[in-house]
Amino acid sequence: MRLHDLKPAEGARRERKRVGRGIGSGHGKTSGRGQKGQKARSGGGVRPGFEGGQMPLTRRLPKRGFTNIFKKEYAIVNVGTLEERFEDGAVITPEALIESGIIKDVKDGVKILGDGDLNKKFTVRAHKFSQSAIEKIQAVGGKAEVI
């Protein structure tokens, strides 16, 4: 096999549909658009969600709730993840979590949650802790410090 023998796989490349090239082609005259009407016109067609003048679903359904502009979004880390990624006796800070690739960015702070087992002793510095995380960290002799 040489470079000039290479061909695309069977059915991988479809020929372009040439419309408006005479009635013998099967796609002549109206070019597959039917007769007159909005969809036959250039640039014609309706926007997504338009239901022909009937009240659209998005407007029939009621509005609910609001967006709390004061909501804080925390980067969440479980104690089980800390167990896997850090050595015994490590001081874990938000910077260390970013460095090790556990979190991408701090957002409004880091919150440590208590999912998973913990057998190593850590000093964890974070913005928030769940009660179960504090209990697990302290049970193995570590420290949970709020920054």
UniProtKB/Swiss-Prot annotation:
Gly residues composition bias: residue spans: 21-35, 42-52
Superkingdom per UniProt: Bacteria
Cross-referenced NCBIfam families: rplO_bact (TIGR01071)
HAMAP family, sorted: Ribosomal_uL15
UniProt organism field: Thermoanaerobacter pseudethanolicus (strain ATCC 33223 / 39E) (Clostridium thermohydrosulfuricum)
Gene name, Swiss-Prot/TrEMBL: rplO
Classification via InterPro entries: Ribosomal_uL15, Ribosomal_uL15/eL18, Ribosomal_uL15/eL18_sf, Ribosomal_uL15_bac-type, Ribosomal_uL15_CS
Keywords, comma-separated and alphabetical: Ribonucleoprotein, Ribosomal protein, RNA-binding, rRNA-binding
Record's protein name: Large ribosomal subunit protein uL15
GO biological process, one term: translation
Function statement: Binds to the 23S rRNA.
